[in-house]
């Protein structure tokens, strides 16, 4: 940074100081946009507050001197104004607040005990006064399952947010940590709830079953955590179950999830005799006493029969840490033993850097060893200041900008979830930078509209606690803000936007209509609400049949919405047979030369397009989206007409010629053509391209693609033959089988079309003891006979409509 820029920055800083003192909006806006080597004068402002003092309350000469000193340091050392440097120099109160904040999610395979574990967390932190179980066995149900359907079915359908304070003993005294927690669904049909939770969280607890270990949805959750770079600790639950084998689960984390993992604990007993754990770092035995395990008892007396195992597992922990942390590696190579503090610091570093996951174990249902998991959340998961969160600066071609969890900086937040409540739309927001205050005006980066925040609440499942302000790094909900999921909000001075969450495409559809016309209004309200709340739930009206079509992630997903419509809106509906989301593609290169020519007196239509269609070779992730390219030379087609050609191509790909389903893996090139001085128009070229596409597509040996689902089935070993028979009837491809002492797990790619009704057949084949889960894997060519039937049925339906 040149000294000229430093001088300009100091001047900007001084101007900003006056603006902040006088709260002049225009001056403040200019201040935020002052150029200081791409960092903006706002960092200079912050720099002038370093060292825990608000230097803007001092004289102008001192203020400018402090700013100049900071900026001169930045000129010599660019790292002086990095996020880390700012965090290191926050005032003591702000630094201490951030250090004690944890934003975490609990995620796992279905029925691994997420909600049960969350219930214990809330009880042990004093957030609830009594423990209630999943499925509403005591007519109350778990706190985080607030929907009636969740309590009936015993599954989590919507992610639920809460907050609590955990008193952790550090250096002989209690330290209070503030935990924002989101409990997520385990069923793949509700995967969007996991996606949007992990998008805004700083860390996670991945729960595994001590018997089943890594399961299909565990692998999906692992993939989602990697997508958003979320550090995790692992908690092996259900240690009291018959067949519990925690070290097998640790081995599966290493092998199947391919992330280095090591146990921090050894169980004291197992199955019915599970009684506590040995902490391998401090080498202490930990027991839970009291009616609900609320009293923690620690002792130096490790059971004699476990001493050798504990020594082996502690050595393995140190060896694993040496592979992922340089400091422990040096100690290990010097054949020394790391101290407790060195081990904990190394686990924290490696976990936050996504190089390692520490593994704890316990039984939430038996009220054992949940508190040590809470200690691990505080010890090993990051606080908001330790996570890199990026925004995109619209002024600089969407260059990434680091956000800093500091209350004094301009506000930046992300709306990640919407819910309808009795008081209107409830919008969940993660505050990444600055603070959000009641009555504050914020700007939606997508719509460029200003909105006022009338009310801020903290959520405790379905209960609300109103607050006047939320600080940086926190999660809250607001009322009265019209927005979409994934919208970025700022204070108006920063042209920032943030990337949204990944939204998978639906794989199943069905037609739906109210049974009576008088329910039409409520039916429309329900459709609009469900679409706003859930990005994976799609609604459209078929242009030809005029039927309302809903699409989602699976049968259960759509069944839940149909049931919610009946319960929440009192609308009885009729649904059609579920329809698979097929795709279409070509397999051969086809050249086209098509002319559209219409003359009806006066101005006519004329457009000639020349080029070719060709298949895009499927990659490791399957069929790619269809693409368009123009290679016209000599100006035979003008740019505006080429743009119309592309629009025609994209419109054609939305509704393919074979079945009316979207087109994948097809590349169109327009390399020549002709225009007419008066008869050519954008509409003519769009129509000509669509006609050329349809004709060429049918000449390119087209195929129907069907979705294949990665299906995981678990059942007792005696039913293995029955299940293999069921899959063979469906032409499934078995990719993996794992046989345990009692149960086996089978993984196969199955056609979604063949899986309708599989649930009832599986129950019959396993006497109700089998379970299965599906998630979308990839598209593949459908069997030839099925393709013929589908095309024939589609053509017949089209002909019938034209007759009408």
Swiss-Prot record:
Q: What molecular function terms (GO) are annotated for this protein?
A: GTP binding; GTPase activity; translation elongation factor activity
Q: What is its main location?
A: mitochondrion
Ranges for the tr-type G domain? 99-385
Any one cellular component term from GO for this entry?
Answer: mitochondrion
Gene3D superfamilies documented for this protein = 3.30.230.10, 3.30.70.240, Elongation Factor G (Translational Gtpase), domain 3, P-loop containing nucleotide triphosphate hydrolases, Translation factors
Q: Which InterPro entries match?
A: EFG_II, EFG_III, EFG_III/V, EFG_IV, EFG_V, EFG_V-like, EFTu-like_2, G_TR_CS
One Gene Ontology biological process:
mitochondrial translational elongation
Q: Which Pfam families match?
A: EFG_C, EFG_III, EFG_IV, GTP_EFTU, GTP_EFTU_D2
Q: Which UniProt keywords apply?
A: Elongation factor, GTP-binding, Mitochondrion, Nucleotide-binding, Protein biosynthesis, Transit peptide
Please list the residues that make up the transit peptide in this record. Answer: 1-63
Location comes to: Mitochondrion
Residues annotated as binding GTP: 108-115, 183-187, 237-240
Pathway it acts in?
A: Protein biosynthesis; polypeptide chain elongation
Q: Which PROSITE patterns match?
A: G_TR_1 (PS00301), G_TR_2 (PS51722)
Give the NCBIfam families listed for this entry: EF-G (TIGR00484), PRK12740.1-5 (NF009381), small_GTP (TIGR00231)
What family is reported?
Answer: Belongs to the TRAFAC class translation factor GTPase superfamily. Classic translation factor GTPase family. EF-G/EF-2 subfamily.
Q: What does this protein do?
A: Mitochondrial GTPase that catalyzes the GTP-dependent ribosomal translocation step during translation elongation. During this step, the ribosome changes from the pre-translocational (PRE) to the post-translocational (POST) state as the newly formed A-site-bound peptidyl-tRNA and P-site-bound deacylated tRNA move to the P and E sites, respectively. Catalyzes the coordinated movement of the two tRNA molecules, the mRNA and conformational changes in the ribosome.
Give the protein name, as stated in the record.
Elongation factor G, mitochondrial
- Organism of origin is Botryotinia fuckeliana (strain B05.10) (Noble rot fungus)
């Amino acid at each position: 940074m040149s000294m000229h820029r430093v001088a300009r920055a100091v001047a900007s800083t001084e101007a900003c100081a006056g603006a902040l003192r006088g709260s002049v909006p225009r001056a403040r806006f200019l201040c935020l946009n002052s150029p200081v080597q791409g960092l903006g004068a706002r960092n200079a402002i912050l720099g002038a507050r370093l060292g825990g003092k608000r230097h803007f309350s001092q004289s102008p000469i001192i203020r400018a001197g402090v700013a100049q000193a900071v900026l001169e340091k930045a000129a010599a050392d660019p790292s002086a104004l990095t996020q880390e440097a700012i965090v290191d120099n926050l005032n003591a109160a702000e630094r201490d607040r951030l250090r004690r904040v944890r934003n975490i999610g609990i995620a796992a395979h279905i029925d691994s005990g997420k909600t049960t574990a969350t219930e214990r967390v809330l009880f042990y932190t004093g957030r609830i006064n009594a423990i209630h179980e999943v499925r509403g066995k005591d007519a109350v149900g778990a706190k985080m399952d607030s929907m009636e359907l969740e309590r009936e079915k015993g599954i989590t359908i919507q992610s639920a947010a809460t907050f609590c304070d955990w008193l952790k003993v550090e250096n002989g005294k209690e330290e209070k940590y503030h935990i924002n927690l989101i409990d997520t669904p385990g069923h793949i049909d509700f995967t969007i709830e996991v996606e949007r939770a992990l998008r805004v969280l700083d860390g996670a607890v991945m729960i595994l079953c001590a018997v089943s270990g890594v399961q299909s949805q565990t692998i999906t959750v692992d993939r989602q955590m990697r997508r958003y770079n979320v550090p995790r600790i692992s908690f092996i639950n259900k240690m009291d179950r018959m067949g519990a084998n925690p070290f097998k689960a640790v081995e599966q984390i290493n092998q199947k999830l391919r992330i280095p993992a090591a146990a921090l604990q050894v169980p004291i007993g197992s199955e019915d005799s599970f009684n506590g754990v040995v902490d391998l770092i401090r080498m202490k035995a930990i027991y839970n006493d009291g009616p609900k395990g609320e009293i923690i008892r620690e002792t130096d007396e490790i059971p004699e029969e476990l001493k050798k195992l504990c020594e082996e597992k502690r050595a393995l922990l140190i060896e694993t840490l040496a592979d992922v942390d340089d400091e422990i590696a040096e100690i290990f190579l010097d054949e020394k033993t790391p101290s407790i503090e060195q081990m904990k610091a190394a686990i924290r570093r490696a976990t936050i850097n996504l190089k390692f996951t520490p593994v704890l174990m316990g039984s939430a249902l038996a009220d054992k060893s949940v508190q040590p998991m809470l200690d691990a959340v505080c010890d090993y998961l990051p606080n908001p200041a330790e996570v890199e969160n990026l925004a995109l600066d619209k002024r600089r071609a969407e260059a990434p900008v680091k956000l800093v969890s500091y209350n004094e900086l301009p506000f930046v937040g992300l709306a990640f979830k919407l819910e309808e409540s009795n008081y209107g739309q409830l919008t969940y927001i993660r505050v990444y930078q600055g603070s959000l205050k009641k009555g504050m005006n914020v700007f939606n980066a997508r719509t460029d509209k200003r909105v006022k925040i009338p009310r801020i609440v903290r959520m405790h499942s379905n209960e609300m606690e109103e607050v006047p302000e939320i600080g940086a790094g926190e999660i809250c909900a607001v009322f009265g803000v019209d927005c979409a999921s994934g919208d970025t909000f700022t204070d108006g001075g920063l042209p920032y936007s943030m990337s949204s969450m990944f939204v998978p495409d639906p794989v199943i559809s069905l037609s739906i209509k109210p049974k009576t016309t008088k329910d039409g209004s409520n039916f429309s309200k329900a459709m609009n609400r469900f679409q706003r709340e859930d990005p994976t739930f799609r609604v459209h009206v078929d242009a030809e049949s005029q039927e309302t079509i809903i699409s989602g992630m699976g049968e259960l997903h759509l069944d839940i919405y149909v049931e919610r419509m009946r319960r929440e809106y009192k609308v009885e509906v009729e649904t059609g047979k579920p329809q698979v989301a097929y795709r279409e593609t070509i397999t051969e290169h086809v050249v086209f030369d098509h002319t559209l020519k219409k003359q009806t007196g006066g101005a006519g239509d004329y457009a000639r397009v020349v080029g070719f269609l060709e298949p895009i070779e499927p990659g490791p992730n399957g069929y790619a989206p269809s693409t368009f390219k123009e290679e016209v030379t000599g100006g035979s087609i003008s740019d505006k007409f080429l743009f119309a050609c592309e629009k025609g191509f994209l419109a054609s790909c939305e509704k393919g010629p074979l079945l009316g389903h979207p087109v994948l893996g097809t590349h169109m090139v327009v390399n020549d053509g002709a225009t007419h001085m008066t008869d050519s128009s954008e509409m003519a070229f769009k129509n000509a391209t669509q006609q050329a596409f349809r004709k060429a597509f049918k000449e390119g040996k087209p195929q129907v693609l069907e979705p294949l689902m990665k299906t995981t089935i678990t059942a007792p070993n005696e039913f293995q033959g029955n299940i293999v028979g069921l899959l063979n009837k469906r032409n499934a491809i078995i990719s993996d089988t794992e046989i345990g002492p009692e149960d086996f797990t089978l993984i196969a790619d199955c056609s979604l079309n063949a899986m309708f009704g599989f649930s009832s057949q599986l129950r019959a084949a396993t006497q109700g003891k089998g379970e299965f889960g599906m998630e979308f894997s990839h598209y593949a060519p459908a069997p030839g006979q099925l393709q013929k039937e589908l095309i024939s049925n589609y053509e017949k339906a089209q002909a019938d409509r034209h007759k009408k």
